[in-house]
A protein has these predicted regions:
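Active-site SXXK
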Residues: 52, 68-95, 117, 165-170, ...
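N-terminal secretory signal peptides and thylakoid transit peptides that target proteins
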Residues: 1-16
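Active-site helix/loop module of the DD-peptidase/beta-lactamase fold
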Residues: 88-122, 174-213, 217, 233-234
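C-terminal segment of N-terminal export signals and the immediately downstream linker at the start
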Residues: 19-35, 41
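Active-site-proximal alpha-helical segments within enzyme catalytic domains
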Residues: 164-168, 213-234, 310-325
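Catalytic-site signature segments of enzymes, centered on catalytic residues
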Residues: 66, 127-214
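Active-site Gly/Thr loop motif
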Residues: 197-199, 247-322
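A short, well-structured edge-of-sheet supersecondary motif
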Residues: 34-64, 312-315, 319-323
């Protein structure tokens, strides 16, 4: 798709930057309409790659190319990759009980598994205070959270489960012949292979990072996660590890290890919802039955979702990676994707 003269002048004005597309090699995309949709809803960036090649970049509302912005819960996926890397390296087993590493967990917490921490079905209270700055030991705070649901039965989205996972990984790695911190392990096994450096970790006084949020990435940097999703885990994980990572749970088949999927879109009775709106409800009022990100778009779509509609979409069947960064302004995943894909 070749940019129109008007659009070209728009580029020169510095409001939008776009790259021409060879229509014979790329899917038919409504790039102009999608960029307008993003810009009109307080979007800062729309960045699209096809087969690893950038086919569209646009920046609006004062944003500039190359700026790193908060991806909020998009951070979770990187730690999910680190968890599966630790499984591959023999440090963790998903079915292993957390209490095998954290013996102080007893009673109802005794049988919680590492996998239940990573798919947010462990039953722990959400622990939203763990997002705060200036904490002494957020890992201990997470370990002390009470059980509010039977492990394995309910999806409870919040930072506490991931902080417990961090404590497990921290103790596992500390026991090795050459001990390293989880942060250094993340950098070596996940970030460096993706061409990324150290990130914004928001450590507490004990040095524990916040796993639920914190990273700041440019569209180009974040798109490397999308490249990995299209490549079924390369260069970080084996394909079979990716299958486990994206499996979902009985409590919420659309989520696992920091990633959201659209598989239900191809099923009878699928429910397209605004995931951020659903997460705003108390956990026991949320309904994750048959939910999908967007109807009418490929069901193999995978998403990393951050607050205020920070989005990474990867669509393997179309070889597409799509990044949207901006503010919350009546943005709809379904409307945006249908606008772009037609």
């Amino acid at each position: 798709m070749i940019a129109s003269r008007r659009h070209f002048l728009h580029l020169l004005a510095g409001l939008t930057t776009a790259r021409a597309v060879n229509a014979a090699d790329s899917p038919k995309l409504n790039l102009t309409a999608a960029a307008r949709y993003v810009e009109e809803r307080k979007g800062y960036a729309l960045y699209i790659k096809h087969r690893g090649r950038v086919i569209h970049e646009s920046y609006a509302n004062g944003a500039k190319r190359g700026e790193a912005r908060r991806i909020y819960s998009g951070t979770k996926g990187f730690w999910g990759l680190a968890a599966m890397a630790a499984v591959e390296d023999g440090y963790l087993k998903l079915e292993e009980k957390v209490s095998a590493t954290i013996p102080e967990w007893s009673g109802g917490k005794k049988d919680i598994t590492i996998e239940q921490l990573l798919d947010f079905t462990c039953g722990l209270e959400r622990g939203l205070r763990l997002h705060q700055d200036g904490l002494t030991n957020r890992n201990q705070m997470a370990l002390d959270r009470p059980l509010v649901a039977t492990p394995g039965k309910s999806f409870i989205y919040g930072p506490s489960a991931l902080q417990v996972y961090h404590e497990v990984l921290k103790r596992k790695l500390a026991a090795q012949k050459r001990p390293v911190s989880p942060t250094h392990y993340l950098e070596r096994r996940v970030l460096r292979p993706l061409g990324l450096g150290p990130q914004r970790y928001l450590p507490d006084a004990k040095g524990n990072p916040l796993l639920a949020a914190g990273f700041m990435l440019s569209p180009n940097q974040w798109s490397r996660m999308g490249d990995l999703l299209l490549a079924n885990g390369k260069p970080v994980l084996k394909p079979e590890s990716m299958d486990m990572l994206l499996e979902g749970s009985a409590a919420n088949a659309a989520f696992s290890f920091g990633f959201w999927n659209n598989r239900a879109a191809g099923k009878l009775g699928a429910r397209e919802i605004d995931i951020e709106d659903m997460l705003e409800l108390d956990w026991d009022r949320q309904n994750w039955s048959r939910v999908c990100i967007a109807k009418g778009v490929p069901k193999d779509l995978i998403a990393c979702i951050g607050s205020s509609y920070q989005r990474l979409f990867a669509i393997p069947s179309l070889d597409l990676v799509i990044i949207r960064q901006g503010l919350n302004a009546k943005f709809s995943d379904g409307d945006f994707l249908r606008t772009l894909l037609g």
